[in-house]
From Swiss-Prot:
Gene3D superfamilies: Ribosomal protein L33 (2.20.28.120). It comes from Pseudarthrobacter chlorophenolicus (strain ATCC 700700 / DSM 12829 / CIP 107037 / JCM 12360 / KCTC 9906 / NCIMB 13794 / A6) (Arthrobacter chlorophenolicus). The gene is rpmG. GO terms for cellular component: cytosolic large ribosomal subunit. It comes from the Bacteria. GO terms for biological process: translation. GO terms for molecular function: structural constituent of ribosome. InterPro entries: Ribosomal_bL33 (IPR001705), Ribosomal_bL33_CS (IPR018264), Ribosomal_bL33_sf (IPR038584), Ribosomal_zn-bd (IPR011332). Keywords: Ribonucleoprotein, Ribosomal protein. This is Large ribosomal subunit protein bL33. Pfam families: Ribosomal_L33.
Amino acid sequence: MAKDKDVRPIIKLKSTAGTGYTYVTRKNRRNDPDRMVLKKYDPKIRQHVEFREER
């Protein structure tokens, strides 16, 4: 059973390019308490852009 405050929650990373493309990943809440920002590939515009954590 999952706890309410899971140590490794599943998060969605949404493209800042406005295409609506998302990645789904997990993060360690103890090491990264802030919102995650990663530079990943957006296939809709064929470029690497920033993806921000969505809640």
